Design a protein with these regions (language model features):
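Glycoside hydrolase catalytic-domain groove-lining segments
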Residues: 1-31, 37-98
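Substrate-binding cleft of secreted/luminal carbohydrate-active enzymes
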Residues: 47-70, 84-158
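Pro/Thr/Ser/Gly-rich low-complexity, intrinsically disordered linker/stalk tracts
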Residues: 136-192, 233, 247-256
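An aromatic-rich alpha-helical recognition segment common to small helix-rich domains
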Residues: 166, 181-185, 199-200, 227, ...
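Solvent-exposed loop/turn segments flanking beta-strands in beta-repeat/beta-sandwich domains
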Residues: 186-212, 236
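Short beta-strand segments within Ig-like beta-sandwich modules, predominantly Fibronectin type-III
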Residues: 215-221
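Short S/T/G- and acidic-enriched coil/turn segments that sit immediately N-terminal to beta-strands
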Residues: 221-227
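Beta-strand-rich modules
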Residues: 227-250
Length: 256
């Protein structure tokens, strides 16, 4: 069934991510046992097999555990991912006293571990507890972990060719401290995978497009953009524009 669905989706829209939310432990690992409840033997899921065969793009394992029930199994997912994207789901609902006795430090440790292993991200279950800022988790994420924008991780197993770069960037100061950017479009002609644009701004030239704090907009469809800084006295002086396709491949930048 999984193979049939994957091939059907890719035949119609190759850039669409096929993903699944498996049980948090695949099976026993050499580091720690799953203690009888796992994806492979208990509920008959084989997400590591699907990733190995190349018929799954992302997995979101439900890893609502602590300590040895979390770290060995998170590492196992990443090691057996075949380069696909692993996004562990974290049990932030345990921060609420009616659900458990976790502290925010537990979530911090898990997120730092995920980043140290270069996984594709993390999910938070349930969003109710995130939006209610349980134990300050929303503020913590906004101030520290998610302080800057992020681009989608690329999917090189589907397409690893970046779009051509936009060109002829023009920067014009207009009224009220706003700045207008205009550029020539990337010259790719795949109507099913037209690139979008990412705008970067900095006081340093050239603008470093590897620094997420320099991203001011993404998903821009047009070949123009009005830069309107929240604090006019903190407006940036230099700009860069890149093209990005549906598979997350980013072009070189045109700078001004």
């Amino acid at each position: 069934i999984v193979r049939y669905i994957y091939k059907g989706v890719k035949a119609m829209k190759p850039w669409v991510k096929v993903s699944t939310c498996p049980v948090g432990k695949y099976r026993d690992t050499s580091r720690y046992p799953s203690r009888g409840w796992n994806a492979f033997f208990t509920v008959y899921q084989d997400p590591q097999g699907w990733m190995g065969e190349g018929i799954m793009d992302q997995i979101y394992p439900m890893m609502y555990f602590q300590g040895n029930n979390f770290y060995p199994f998170a590492l196992d997912w990443q090691e057996q991912s075949n380069g696909r994207q692993v996004v562990p789901g974290l049990g932030i609902y345990f921060l609420h006293p009616d659900e458990g006795k976790w502290t925010r430090d537990e979530i911090d440790r898990q997120m730092n571990f995920i980043r140290s292993q270069k996984m594709a991200g993390e999910g938070h279950y349930r969003v109710k507890y995130l939006m209610e800022n349980t134990q300050g988790i929303y503020d913590e994420l906004a101030e520290n972990f998610y302080a800057y924008p992020a681009l989608q991780p690329p999917m090189p197993w589907l397409d690893n060719v970046p779009p051509t770069a936009p060109s002829e960037l023009k920067v014009t100061d207009i009224n009220n401290g706003y700045t207008e950017l205009k550029w020539q479009a990337a010259t790719d002609h795949d109507s099913r995978n037209n690139p979008l644009y990412v705008i970067y701004a900095s006081n340093e030239f050239p603008v470093d497009t590897n620094r997420p704090e320099n991203i001011v907009a993404q998903g821009v469809r047009e070949t123009s953009y009005i830069y309107a800084p929240i604090l006019p006295w903190n407006a940036k002086k230099h700009f860069a524009v890149t093209a990005i396709d549906r598979c997350g491949n980013e072009s070189a930048a045109v700078q001004k």
